[in-house]
Regions:
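C-terminal regulatory
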Residues: 11-131, 157-158
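A bilobed periplasmic-binding-protein/Venus flytrap-type ligand-binding module shared by bacterial periplasmic
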Residues: 131-140
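Short amphipathic alpha-helical coupling segments at ligand-binding clamshell hinges
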Residues: 104, 140-152
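Short, small-residue-biased leader/transition segments that mark boundaries at the very start
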Residues: 1-7
Length: 158
């Protein structure tokens, strides 16, 4: 028995059908201690040398993506010496001073507001996180699964 649906970022080479659910804005942050130790980077290419927190699932772990002026993506292979398996763990590591991180803007905003994290802005913004409902076959998708996908799309897009 296989699963009927999963929620994740887009799979590039997949036989699954992907329905976009939500776009989550992201930002680059670091703890004040990291900024004190390494300074504030002025170019995204500096992340190739600076300590960065990467997420195992996102872009297969190492590269970070930024949106360029033309709306396309620029990928930087960062110095990802600390890898985690969730955005929550990346946030905790960033607050602890492990390194620079790309996090969901909404999730880290309280820590930016209270000074535990510093947001670092560049001409190229961090690529947003895209979440999709993935399922194998539209024709045989059970009604309850289709209803769940429709509900999530409606709730997350508002």
């Amino acid at each position: 028995v296989g699963s009927e649906m999963c929620i994740r970022d887009r799979m590039d080479d997949s036989d699954y059908i992907a329905r976009h659910l939500v776009t989550i804005p992201c930002t680059i942050v670091a703890a004040p201690s990291v900024i004190q130790r390494y300074g504030t980077p002025s170019r995204i290419q500096q992340f190739e040398e600076l300590p960065c927190i990467t997420t195992v699932n996102a872009l297969k772990g190492a590269p970070w993506q930024f949106v360029n002026k033309k709306g396309g993506f620029e990928t930087i292979k960062v110095n990802g010496r600390y890898r985690v398996n969730s955005g929550e763990m990346a946030g905790r590591a960033a607050i602890s001073g492990v390194g620079f991180a790309i996090l969901s803007k909404q999730a880290c905003q309280p820590y930016i507001d209270d000074g535990r994290l510093i947001e670092i802005e560049f001409e190229q913004s961090a690529a947003p996180l895209q979440l999709f409902a993935l399922y194998s076959d539209r024709r045989y998708l059970p009604a309850k699964t289709r209803a769940l996908i429709d509900f999530m799309h409606q709730r997350l897009s508002h």
